[in-house]
């Protein structure tokens, strides 16, 4: 069984389709940064992803994909961020969704995701994101549609500092 493979843990993951809906009246679209400083983005991500790659490796990967038009990074009020990990031929994978700890519960991420879903739909793009069990209820509450469910394996024996450039 999958759960018995040494040095791996089994995680349940759902795929959600982003469904456009209106952000709250408090949302300020002028506070969305379409080309934020990647150093600021990394600071937000560090608060939400404890196993995030070290900055030089992350920066090399993300900046390369952004320069070549494959990815886009956005922020809202320099407190929430998301990445259009792959944006290709009107198909978008959204990932690295995070909000600074001090702003969690403010509704920033919820509004930002709703705005992003509308923004992408206006461009004729179909967007999805993956969510682990702990975040599934959040995406359902936003109104995103669960379209698939699967189990993935994650290695448990590799420490962050052991990750090398080739791991990307």
Features from the language model and the residues they span:
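A conserved beta-strand-loop-helix scaffold within acyl/acetyltransferase catalytic domains
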Residues: 52-98
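Conserved acetyl-CoA-binding loop-helix of GNAT-fold acetyltransferases
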Residues: 99, 105-122, 141
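Acyl-donor-binding surface of acyltransferase catalytic domains
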Residues: 1-29, 150-158
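Conserved active-site alpha-helix within GNAT-family acetyltransferase domains
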Residues: 1-10, 110, 133-150
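Conserved GNAT acetyl-CoA-binding A-motif
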Residues: 1, 120-132
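A short beta-loop-alpha structural element at the N-terminal edge
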Residues: 28-43
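Acyl-donor (CoA/ACP) binding surface of acyl/acetyltransferases
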Residues: 73, 78-92, 110, 124-125, ...
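Helix-loop element at the rim of GNAT/NAT acetyltransferase active sites that forms part
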Residues: 43-55
